[in-house]
Amino acid sequence: TLHQTKKGLVAALEHGRRECRGQYIARLDADDIALPGRLDHQIAALDTDPSLAAVGGRATLFTDHGPVPRGMQYYIDWINNLDDPHREILVESPLLHPAVTFRATHVEHIGGYRSGEVPEDYDLWLRLVADGFRIANVAHEVVSIRDHSSRLTRTDSRYSRTAFDSCRRNFLQKTALLRPRRIVLWAGVRGGRPWLRWLKTGGHQVIAVIDITKSIVRSGVPVLPPAALPDLDLDILLVAVGARGARGQIRNELATLRPDLVEGHNWWALL
């Protein structure tokens, strides 16, 4: 057991990480339960693929009192059915922090956890991938997570929508948007406005907004229906539509309208 004065979560994570001497480091919150076989499955994955930096897995969720909140269960269901964390890395954090085992050298290479107004785990996964490393989930339940109202994800500003968007934008700036691009933004008014503003401020040419509304122009950018996509000369498509089920519908439409676009390569869902 390691002891230090109270300095916050990131300081504790970094203190523990630096004291570790093994090749791999496994995370677990004190009130969660590691399931039998967790380390066997994750270490086997890491041993097999040296490019893997971090490996998570499936999870179950429980509470001490009352039902599991619907939003958290929806997130766990998404994780448990996630085929490719890289493909949907900008939707949400694709690895559950308490379920992760990571390669010590790769995390050290990018400087470990960072403090600041960002979710420290999501920020870490994104920086690993931006630096060329891979992440994955094993197809096994590896942890049972205790959900409660005092979780930092519900009470700390580092886990706000704004903080997550900051991580997404930092990732895009280091990867797909490293230089000015011709971008199409598929988004409604509410979800799209901050992204449209950010893209234009960054010097990117937003050639169209895709929406089913009857708007003609939004912030100087033409608003077009999905049927217009085949005729657009674009580099990157960003999708900021948060309605439940919309992501799958849009994915299906894109397979027909723009089969040349590959999710996680030149188009991303942001919600």
What residue ranges belong to the model's regions?
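Catalytic core of nucleotide-sugar-dependent glycosyltransferases
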Residues: 140-141, 145-148, 153-179
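Phosphate-bearing ligand-interacting subdomains
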Residues: 214-271
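Short beta-strand segments
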Residues: 56-58, 185-186, 211, 240
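Conserved Rossmann-like nucleotide-cofactor binding loop
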Residues: 60, 191, 215
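Glycine-rich adenosine-cofactor-binding loop
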Residues: 180-199
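Nucleotide-sugar donor-binding/catalytic module of glycosyltransferases
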Residues: 1-156
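NAD(P)-binding Rossmann-fold cofactor-contacting core
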Residues: 204-218
